[in-house]
Amino acid sequence: MAKYIPKTGSRKNVRIGSRNHTRKIPKGIIHVQASFNNTIVTITDVRGRVISWSSAGTCGFKGTRRGTPFAAQTAAGNAIRTVSDQGMQRAEIMIKGPGLGRDAALRAIRRSGILLNFIRDVTPMPHNGCRSPKKRRV
């Protein structure tokens, strides 16, 4: 029986271009979404393309520990470490949500050495929109 010879230039096996394309990003936007259960930090460039992200869950915190301020601080530090290597110097911060990690994430970003243009709270507030769910009785 004839021996199978795999094609070396097949489209399946060859990656066109690199996956981790490092480009210089002088300015970016840091989005912090702090809920009661988790804190997600996403860093984008000015056009909105995601450069780096991290959350308390990806940093190894499980269960109720994800909502703690220390978990938010760790998540913010992990996200910023990757973009500071790419040369980010200036950033704008958008903070969303009522969680405990808001201030801790902001403190970690401040300590990183990135200059902040402004800090904006973009928490969605209804102007008497949909009816809220009933309160829990425990």
Swiss-Prot record:
Coiled-coil stretches: none
One protein family per Pfam: Ribosomal_S11
GO biological process per UniProt: translation
GO molecular function, one term: rRNA binding
Subcellular location field: Plastid, Chloroplast
Family: Belongs to the universal ribosomal protein uS11 family.
Classification via PANTHER family: 40S RIBOSOMAL PROTEIN S14/30S RIBOSOMAL PROTEIN S11
Protein name, UniProt field: Small ribosomal subunit protein uS11c
Native source species: Phaseolus vulgaris (Kidney bean)
